[in-house]
Amino acid sequence: MPLFTTLSIIHNAGIIHRGISPENIIVTTDCELKLTGFCISSIRTSNTGLSPEFYSGYTAPEQYSSLEWQGTWTDVYALAAVLYRILTGCMPLDAYTRTKNDTMVEACRVNPRIPQHISRVLSRAMRVRGEERIQTVSELVTALFEQHTTHMEHPKGSTQTIPIQ
């Protein structure tokens, strides 16, 4: 959760990271996660001849166009893509490719042990159109961790253990 908290704090300060990827998440010897590479894209492009750095599979679609707005939803896309990679073991499809032909496979289809609820949240957080995406890290956290009291999803073939009284 510290990574989610860090992103919420920087977003509340008006800062968008624009480069979240496994390469920019460092695990310390104390097993803490550190996010690096802040604002690299804005530094690289402001009054220079440099192009922004894109992270295939993690860069949000709107980052490929100078005409589209970027915001907290841009980082939500990248964070969800990192979670997708962790949970499935597969690289997410490149967003630029997805804008032309979206063939992204849901996480639960890649790894059947992923609950459908989590898979749906990741799909919503990685929608191609920014306005259709989960907008903030706090919304992402709420969606990922909300409890389903009326219907708990269990993987096929699983059984429920009921304590003996």
Question: Where are the model-predicted features located?
Answer:
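Protein kinase catalytic-loop region centered on the HRD/HxD motif
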Residues: L3-I15
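Canonical protein kinase catalytic loop motif
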Residues: I16, S21-P22, I26
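Conserved protein kinase catalytic/activation segment
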Residues: N24-G37
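Conserved protein kinase catalytic core
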Residues: I43-T45, M91
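Activation loop
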Residues: T48-G57
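C-terminal lobe helix-coil module of Hanks-type protein kinase domains
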Residues: G57-T149, E153
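Regulatory extensions appended to serine/threonine kinase catalytic cores
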Residues: H151-Q165
